[in-house]
Amino acid sequence: GAWNAEKYGEALNLKDRYFEVTEPFTSMQLISNTANVVVKATDTDTCTVTATNMPENTIKVTVEDDKLCINAVPEHRKWYQYFQMGVNPPTSTITLSLPMNVYEQVELQNDIGNLTLQNVHADRISLKSDTGDVDLQSITGKTCSITNNIGSLSLQEVQIREQTDIQQD
């Protein structure tokens, strides 16, 4: 029969998850190892996290010490689970929708996958990507640090007032 990506995702136990963050926070940190990450401002007062095609029990969303923490790194993974033979599984995507505020710090770390930051305002912005494209659109801040090992870097309407540090390998 024809290839069915949805059934393949089910066989790999991939799930879609949705979180609504009700606790207040002034900074955020998102750590992922294999997903496309999109962080964008929204015109609502509610912060939401949507994760698609994620292995079960691999994403945790908490607020600790006024910081939103999103951890999308599997806790116990065997070395051979990082390799996929044959057809690749559907791409995981994490979308964080933030209320339109000025945040103290926005920190994104991703091993494999694209990082997109849209319409976000923060004092300190820190982005680290090992493999994937980094795209910033309509960003303002005091300081910005971007490390991108493999992949393209796109900056559109980015205004940093004090210091910008970009490392592109």
Q: At which residue positions do the language-model features occur?
A:
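Acidic (Asp/Glu) and glycine-rich low-complexity loops/linkers
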Residues: 1-31, 36-110, 116-128, 135-148, ...
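Long, intrinsically disordered low-complexity tandem-repeat regions enriched in serine/threonine/proline
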Residues: 168-169
